[in-house]
Amino acid sequence: MNKKFLINVCLLLTVYCAGFVNAKQSISIKTDGGQAKKNIIMTVRGPIKPGSFGKALPHEHILVDFIGADKTGTGRYDAKEVVSIMLPYLRELKNRGFTGFVDCSPAFLARDVKVLKRLSEQTGIHILTNTGCYGANNGKYLPEYVIAESADQLAARWTAEWENGIEGTGIYPGFIKTAVNPGALNDTDKKLIQAAAMTHLKTGLTIACHTGQAQAALAVLEIIRQQGVDPSTLIIVHANGIADPNVRIKIAAAGAWVELDGVNKNSIAQNVQFIKELMLAGLLNRTLVSQDAGWYNVGDEKGGQTDNKIRPFTAIADQLIPALKQAGLTNAQIRRLIVENPAKAYTVKVKKL
């Protein structure tokens, strides 16, 4: 047995083993109904254990384009510029000990998963992207197929992104993002929520729904139940916009997540009050806090940086947490808000009624 033969055998074994490992990794990502991906958090760099998410912001934005579904596209901005401009904001966040970041820009509102992955790779922050469609603003951000297709067909589209990745990138959604109009839900709003519920039952992905108003929020919760989905998979986005605190308590008591995502330097006292109301009702374990901050706004010079329109992601770290401590919350209670709740909310798991 000569030296050359041994080298060739070793090379063949290396290739074989690499292929076997890759096959195993592929199986863990793409299986029947995506069930191999349960009990993890799916980031743009792949699955992580919930305990690795760390301090996290459950509702922020890197990039947004408000021009509308019929006009938006990657040709409207320079991806390299987006990364260059937004990178320092994420590094500021990382320097404050935050390692989890949920990007809530959906498809047709400038969801760019490649940009998110590049930022995640350069900062080490665990970034989540999404599947789903955004129906608020009277459907301005909905593609034509949403109107034409049934809830089942929409769910099939969104489930396919979970099973196969988004647009051939090999990047997978970590949750379902949708949105409805305020007040009574129209037929399209209802269809979007039905489709989101169907997608959850096939994937285990959490549903984050933009509402910000009591009637719509309660209607969304009811549809989720009607579809046989446990409310604990639903995040009521912009719950700080619900005027009646009793409605927030009602939603949280039903098991859904109440997301107070309007934290900024001017709303600290208000958000402390909202958090204490939920805490006194025994519902701190159903409460999320975030800032709805950022972002590179397509159409503005340098995404808005020139005019100081980009809001940093640091209000919770710099202002809300100290205010909560001053208000009497313990370190354990703050950890629940900032670490435990986001990880629990975004853990992939099918939850049926």
PLM features: residue spans?
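Alpha-helical scaffold segments that flank or form the walls of functional sites
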Residues: 54-58, 71-126, 152-171
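Divalent metal-coordination and catalytic microenvironments
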Residues: 59, 101, 200, 258, ...
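Histidine/acidic-residue-rich catalytic or RNA/ligand-binding cores of hydrolases
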Residues: 66-70, 113, 139, 216-223, ...
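Divalent metal-binding pocket/active-site signature
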Residues: 165-243
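Short acidic/histidine-rich active-site segments
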Residues: 208, 261-262, 283-307, 334
